[in-house]
From Swiss-Prot:
GO terms for molecular function: proton-transporting ATP synthase activity, rotational mechanism. The gene is atpI. It comes from Ranunculus macranthus (Large buttercup). CDD domains: ATP-synt_Fo_a_6. This is ATP synthase subunit a, chloroplastic. The keyword Cytoplasm does not apply. InterPro entries: ATP_syn_F0_a_bact/chloroplast (IPR045082), ATP_synth_F0_asu (IPR000568), ATP_synth_F0_asu_AS (IPR023011), F0_ATP_A_sf (IPR035908). Disulfide bonds: none annotated. Pfam families: ATP-synt_A (PF00119). It is found in: Plastid, Chloroplast thylakoid membrane. Its main location: plastid. GO terms for cellular component: chloroplast thylakoid membrane; plasma membrane; proton-transporting ATP synthase complex.
Length: 247
């Protein structure tokens, strides 16, 4: 069985995908490395929003919560419930990871739908949601893969690898490829949906009066939120699956 070469080729393919370019890009040279400036700018903006929100959320909490405090507590409770549902009773240590993934993707997606990035002129290319770039989605999917391997090894030790021959050793190649293709599916699903949503809005705005694309933009906001939920749910489900050892 050529299991190892297949797995290596899958990882190599994932690395090659991170170099895929859609449209023009504006680059910065940092320490001898060429990086996508658009992705860094919009990602830093999203991170600033999240950090600012976190500072506001933990500053001066009230015994009788304000509307803002109620909102942040609801978001935290939602993420905790999501993690507990997918991972089980040992969900606690994974809440920060799942929450970070969900919130970063959610705010990134909505920033692409709500913020007028395109009015900011760049020498090449244009600004868009961070998740509109395959490099970002791959960068989000790879830590998810590391997380579920880490969760399984921490819970079961080397016995974790026994799942690859369940229910029969004949399925060994398929079970191995399944784990190594999970980041591929996560990356392409998020990237494809966000890119398609932004392209549809751009085309409609260029073809019809400005009022007509508004319903499509609201639909884009809805699907953007759903994509963040799907990514976080699948990430938590993969972690829970690796700890329980079932498929």
């Amino acid at each position: 069985m050529n299991v190892l070469p297949c797995s290596v080729n899958t990882l190599k393919g994932l690395y090659d995908i991170s170099g895929v370019e859609v449209g023009q890009h504006f680059y910065w040279q940092i320490g001898g490395f060429q990086v996508h400036a658009q992705v860094l700018i919009t990602s830093w903006f999203v991170i600033a929003i999240l950090l600012g929100s976190a500072i506001i959320a933990v500053r001066n909490p009230q015994t009788i919560p304000t509307d803002g405090q109620n909102f942040f507590e609801y978001v935290l409770e939602f993420i905790r419930d999501l993690s507990k549902t997918q991972i089980g009773e040992e969900y606690g240590p994974w809440v920060p990871f799942i929450g970070t993934m969900f919130l970063f993707i959610f705010v990134s997606n909505w920033s692409g739908a709500l913020l007028p990035w395109k009015i900011i002129q760049l020498p090449h290319g244009e600004l868009a949601a961070p998740t509109n770039d395959i490099n970002t989605t791959v960068a989000l999917a790879l830590p998810t893969s590391v997380a579920y391997f880490y969760a399984g090894l921490t819970k079961k030790g080397l016995g974790y690898f026994g799942k690859y021959i369940q229910p029969t050793p004949i399925l060994l190649p398929i079970n191995i490829l399944e784990d190594f293709t999970k980041p591929l599916s996560l990356s392409f699903r998020l990237f494809g949906n966000i890119l398609a949503d932004e392209l549809v809005v751009v085309v409609l705005v260029s073809l019809v009066p400005s009022v007509v694309p508004i319903p499509v933009m609201f639909l884009g906001l809805f699907t953007s939120g759903i994509q963040a939920l799907i990514f976080a749910t699948l990430a938590a489900a993969y972690i829970g699956e690796s700890m329980e050892g079932h498929h």
